[in-house]
A protein has these predicted regions:
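STAS-typified acidic loop motif
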Residues: 2-28, 48-49
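Short acidic-hydrophobic, aromatic-tinged amphipathic segments that line or gate anion-handling sites
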Residues: 95-97
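Amphipathic alpha-helical interaction surfaces in cytosolic regulatory modules
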Residues: 22-93
């Protein structure tokens, strides 16, 4: 898994590629910063797989942003990843575009 960070005007974008699984999810969690942010974006264009560990990281990041009064968006998930979000009900919780 590769992660690229971009911070601009209170908006942190994490561009992730590869698989978010049990081995890589802790690393992604370590990259999530919510303090002082108004928006957190996960660009999942090049993510091919998300396990339950990855879902946990995304859900916790969402909760932190809501508590901080900000918003979180997931952008460009591949069809297989979007299907995981649909099957788990995450499409009802998270903003996915």
């Amino acid at each position: 898994m590769e992660i690229t960070k971009s911070l601009e005007s209170g908006k942190l974008t994490l561009t992730v590629s590869g698989e978010i699984d049990t081995l890589t999810a802790p690393r992604l969690d370590g990259e999530v910063e919510t303090e002082g942010l108004s928006e957190l974006v996960f660009d999942l264009t090049d993510v091919t797989y998300v396990s339950s560990a990855g879902l946990r990281v995304l859900l916790l990041a969402h909760k932190k942003m809501v508590q901080a009064g900000g918003k979180m968006t997931i952008t460009h998930p591949q069809e297989a990843v979007r299907r995981v979000f649909t099957l788990t009900g995450f499409v009802k919780i998270l903003t996915i575009v």
